Amino acid sequence: MGMSGHGMPAARWGAGTLLVLGALVGCSGGDGKPSAHAGASSTAAGPTKGPGDYRPPTALCPKVDFGPLTAAVAPTSGAPKGELTGSDPSTSSGAACLQAFRTTGTKADGRSTVYCSAWKDVPTAIKVYAYRLSSAPKEAQGAVVKESGLGVEAFRYQNVKDAAPFADDLRLVVRDSNMECEVQVQSLKPLTDQQVEAAWPAMAVTVRTLLPELRS
C-alpha cells in the first residue's frame, strides 16, 4: 500500500510539487512536546467496526480555519485553493485545501495544506492509519510523536523523504472514525525553532476545530 490517506502521495498537489511552487511564487501577497514515540502498531480506542461517522467532504476550504497557523508560522498569501482527492471513490473520497504563506517579503514561499478523506468504513481507516504510522519513521527526521486528545488517534513528524524543494515539511495525521485528516506545513525557507514549536499545536487546533464541521 503506497498511498496516503487522502488518495495521493502526500507531497503532491494536482500536477505536482513543481507546478505548485510556480503557483506559490506567482502569488503576492498544545505545547508541542513529545507525548510518546510512535510504534509500529495502532492502539486505537473507539468503535472499530461499521461504516463510520463521516461522509466524504466535497468543499474543504470553507470549513478550514487557517487563523492558528497564520499566527504561528507566517501571514497568508492569496486565497486558499481547494480540490477533490481520492483515486477510488468506492474506497476513499475526500478534499484538500491549500493556503500559501510568506515568511519574508511579498512572495509566497510556503504552504499549509489540509487533506481529509472519508474511508468506506472504520476498519479500512484503521488499517490505513496503522500502515502510515508504521511507515512514518522511515520518512521522519527525529521522533514520530503520538498525539493524545486529537480524534481517536494521531501522530506527527518532520518529513524528510522526498521533501525537496522544501526546507521544512511538518506533518500531522489524525484519524477519527472513518475520517483521516492530514495537515502539512511546508516552507521553501527554513523555519525558525520558534515557528516549528508554534506550528505543532496550531496544526492540532486546525484539525480539532475542523472535525466537528465535517460531521455536520
Q: What is each of the regions a protein language model found here?
A:
Residues 31-216:
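A small/polar (G/S/T-enriched), proline-flanked helix-loop surface module common
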Residues 2-3, 216:
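Short, intrinsically disordered, low-complexity terminal/loop segments
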Residues 24-31:
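Bacterial signal peptide processing site
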Residues 3-17:
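Bacterial N-terminal signal peptides that target proteins for export
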Residues 16-24:
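Bacterial N-terminal signal peptides
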